[in-house]
Swiss-Prot record:
In the hair cortex, hair keratin intermediate filaments are embedded in an interfilamentous matrix, consisting of hair keratin-associated proteins (KRTAP), which are essential for the formation of a rigid and resistant hair shaft through their extensive disulfide bond cross-linking with abundant cysteine residues of hair keratins. The matrix proteins include the high-sulfur and high-glycine-tyrosine keratins. Belongs to the KRTAP type 4 family. It comes from the Eukaryota. Residues 5-123 are annotated as: 20 X 5 AA repeats of C-C-[GIKRQVHEML]-[SPTRV]-[STVQRCP]. GO terms for cellular component: cytosol; keratin filament. The lineage of its organism: Eukaryota, Metazoa, Chordata, Craniata, Vertebrata. InterPro entries: KAP. Interacts with hair keratins. Expressed in the hair follicles. It holds the Pfam family Keratin_B2_2. Keywords: Keratin, Repeat. It comes from Homo sapiens. GO terms for biological process: hair cycle. Sequence repeats lie at residues 5-9, 24-28, 29-33, 34-38, 44-48, 49-53, 54-58, 59-63, 64-68, 69-73, 74-78, 79-83, 84-88, 89-93, 94-98, 99-103, 104-108, 109-113, 114-118, 119-123. This is Keratin-associated protein 4-7.
């Protein structure tokens, strides 16, 4: 019965909750009704199955990087899209320009593209937040005017 659920019937009509077994977790079976705890499998991670309850660590695939999937367990480098800019996603591999929010101003986020005024909040230069890659004109504000921050692009 479960095997037959993993065919066109499941793809067209979806599986009932009691039929969502591990053997039924195939891309064609990832309909709304199939997003249950037994269906959190990598093979189920398709765009049509990216529901909030399906955002487990095994489901962090490129096709599953959706705003509703932006949870702590889904903060993998491949999930760092603009809609995934959350505090829990602030890791070095996730430091993209669109992720440079004030909540993302961490030492690992000091990249040239991340040097925005909201990231220049520490007055003492030479500490972890004052990397050479962050010495940009946009970083020269009253709270970060020390000589150590005056790189050629900042003068």
């Amino acid at each position: 019965m479960v095997s037959s659920c993993c065919g066109s019937v499941c793809s067209d009509q979806g599986c009932s909750q009691d039929l969502c077994q591990e053997t039924c977790c195939r891309p064609s079976c990832c309909q709304t009704t199939c997003c249950r705890t037994t269906c959190y499998r990598p093979s189920c991670c398709v765009s049509s199955c990216c529901r909030p309850q399906c955002c487990q660590s095994v489901c962090c695939q490129p096709t599953c990087c959706r705003p509703t999937c932006c949870e702590t367990t889904c903060c993998h480098p491949r999930c760092c899209i603009s809609s995934c800019c959350r505090p829990s996603c602030c890791m070095s591999s996730c430091c993209k320009p669109q992720c440079c929010q004030s909540v993302c101003c961490q030492p690992t986020c000091c990249r040239p593209s991340c040097c925005r005024p909201c990231c220049c909040l520490r007055p003492v230069c030479g500490r972890v937040s004052c990397h050479t890659t962050c010495y940009r004109p946009t970083c020269v504000i009253s709270t970060c005017p020390r000589p150590l921050c005056c790189a050629s692009s900042c003068c």
